[in-house]
Amino acid sequence: MTQRVRTRFAPSPTGFIHLGNIRSAFYPWAFARRMKGDFILRIEDTDVERSTDVAVDVILESMAWLDLDIDEGPFYQMQRMDRYREVVQQMLDNELAYHCYMSTEELDALREAQRAAGEKPRYNGFWRPEPGKVLPEPPAGVQPVVRFKNPIGGSVVWDDAVKGRIEISNDELDDLVIARPDGTPTYNFCVVVDDLDMKITHVIRGDDHVNNTPRQINIIRALGGEVPVYAHLPTVLNEQGEKMSKRHGALPVTGYRDEGYLPEAVLNYLARLGWAHGDAEIFSREQFVEWFDLEHLGKSPAQYNPEKLAWLNNHYIKVGDNTRLADLTRPFIEALGGKVEGANLVDVIALVKDRANTLKEVAQTAMLFYRGEPQADAALKAEHLTDEIRPALQALATQLAALPEWKREAISAAFKAVLAEFGLKMPKLAMPVRLLVAGQLQTPSIDAVLELFGRDTVLRRLAAA
């Protein structure tokens, strides 16, 4: 029987979560969904000084917005301390680990001497028990660390699903501290215990974890566990070619929501940020899950391109359901001071959305319907509301008032009749109408705008001429 696929996302809640971070959730989520497996969320919160509840909330909020549903969790490492201590003791009992009494000062001096000799700084195994080796008495009053007995000689080898075969000599690895003097376990040890207990089969994570992998594999093997498949994703770079980070100006995932991006656009963009399916650029979440595999993960760093994300967002806005878009855009309109009353918002969205890259831009255009009475610039009024044009405006108002149906086509016909009667070009009449009705010179098609404003509002505002 084939083993059930189990993947995990294991963020540290020490800051906000950006696109590069959330990609390490999206890919294992998609792989688990494609393989009919399980996706687990684990919060690695052992860095007590830097971990915050706010950061945990942001992780959960970001995943909820993108609808990256989990099958198990969230599990918190701080709630599993007893389990880690239990395994540390098992390793001590089975002589897989040992107590090391070397002080910080002694370790610093050792490393300094190694550097001076041109050697790689590392622990020298002084307190490591070996057959025939006589250890000194433990110094009084010193709380030891616990070190893992890393294999001596040989290599750690694994076939990374992204990077290919990787081989690290065990001579490059010293005996890792797995528990501090106060008994708290260290990061690499907790990760191994969690992955074994949670039966993780595939570890899909950023390539900043490659250096941790040989140590984790050695501990897994010492504990008799099965080594998972590792897939280390290349770094995501910002526009300047630097590693994406808060320090280098990266937005948190929730920041894209707040700027008016749609989750489906962000996911589509993330899908292509290090993975490809032929030349396909636009595809749904369901298509991505169907197509996703580890074989087509990119090996080179992926660079963030805001123009590409904006293009995708524009696509999803254009094809999006107008009722849903109206619900999502309403808060942006209200944030601009608009009152959504009068013109039907769903119809307004349908009219204005096609050129918008974000819901914020949709809201900014839609504001012409919801900002209240128009306050046109006096200079513009003087330029466009001339004595010459007023008779045509009055004739248009008469035509509009007599329309049997307030429909765009009928409004357009009324304009054409007045233009023909007065020998005018469309801009000569449309500009003052825009100023009077909308308070601005730039709007979508004037007949569509007037239809949405409604007959009463249009006639009342034209009367101000």
Swiss-Prot record:
It is an enzyme of class 6 (ligase). The keyword Signal does not apply. A motif ('KMSKS' region) lies at residues 243-247. GO terms for cellular component: cytosol. It is found in: Cytoplasm. It holds the Pfam family Anticodon_2. The keyword Metal-binding does not apply. Keywords: Aminoacyl-tRNA synthetase, ATP-binding, Cytoplasm, Ligase, Nucleotide-binding, Protein biosynthesis. It catalyses: tRNA(Glu) + L-glutamate + ATP = L-glutamyl-tRNA(Glu) + AMP + diphosphate. GO terms for molecular function: ATP binding; glutamate-tRNA ligase activity; tRNA binding; zinc ion binding. GO terms for biological process: glutamyl-tRNA aminoacylation. A motif ('HIGH' region) lies at residues 11-21. Its EC number is 6.1.1.17. SUPFAM superfamilies: An anticodon-binding domain of class I aminoacyl-tRNA synthetases (SSF48163), Nucleotidylyl transferase (SSF52374). ATP binds at residue 246. Monomer. Belongs to the class-I aminoacyl-tRNA synthetase family. Glutamate--tRNA ligase type 1 subfamily. Catalyzes the attachment of glutamate to tRNA(Glu) in a two-step reaction: glutamate is first activated by ATP to form Glu-AMP and then transferred to the acceptor end of tRNA(Glu). PANTHER family: GLUTAMATE--TRNA LIGASE, GLUTAMATE--TRNA LIGASE, MITOCHONDRIAL-RELATED. This is Glutamate--tRNA ligase. It comes from Cupriavidus metallidurans (strain ATCC 43123 / DSM 2839 / NBRC 102507 / CH34) (Ralstonia metallidurans).
